[in-house]
């Protein structure tokens, strides 16, 4: 339930400057995760696209009655004036991100098949973006996801 609420707030275009929430520590770690780490995923990319997140503090289970089985974290997300990467089509960007994490153990070229693109088209856009399709999506930076999305946008113009 946490992820849909956070994403709804981030995508809402409400006039907010920052979002401060308490979430399970594992969710907070996913929100601030860097490429190539086990916690890095689509949530990391989305939160970091819209905000500059940082974990403010951890809240131990004993702080609550009854005590939950997990540690919580307070995370501050300062909304960006503009995303850190230039994207031609934001929906296409998030479609590429979703594909990149659809099957974590597969190569990016294989996970891109979930978009409905042909193998030849995938190879074409990866070449245009100068991306090695044999890498896994969880190693991609925001810029690399943007490069693939922008290459795709250019191919469908």
Regions found by a protein language model. Give the residues of each.
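Class I S-adenosyl-L-methionine
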Residues: 1-137, 147-157
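Interdomain hinge/lid region at the active-site interface
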Residues: 144
């Amino acid at each position: 339930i946490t992820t849909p609420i956070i994403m709804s707030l981030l995508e809402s275009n409400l006039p907010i400057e920052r979002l401060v929430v308490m979430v399970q520590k594992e969710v907070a770690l996913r929100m601030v995760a860097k490429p190539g780490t086990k916690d890095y995923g689509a949530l990391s990319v989305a939160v970091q696209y819209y905000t500059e997140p940082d974990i403010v503090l951890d809240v131990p289970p004993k702080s609550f009655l009854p005590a939950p089985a997990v540690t919580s974290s307070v995370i501050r997300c300062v909304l960006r004036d503009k995303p850190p990467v230039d994207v031609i089509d934001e929906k296409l960007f998030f479609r590429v991100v979703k594909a990149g994490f659809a099957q974590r153990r597969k190569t990016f070229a294989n996970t891109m098949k979930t978009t409905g693109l042909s193998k030849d088209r995938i190879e074409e856009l990866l070449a245009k973006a100068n991306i090695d399709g044999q890498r896994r999506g969880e190693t991609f930076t925001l810029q690399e996801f943007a490069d693939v999305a922008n290459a795709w946008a250019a191919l469908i113009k």
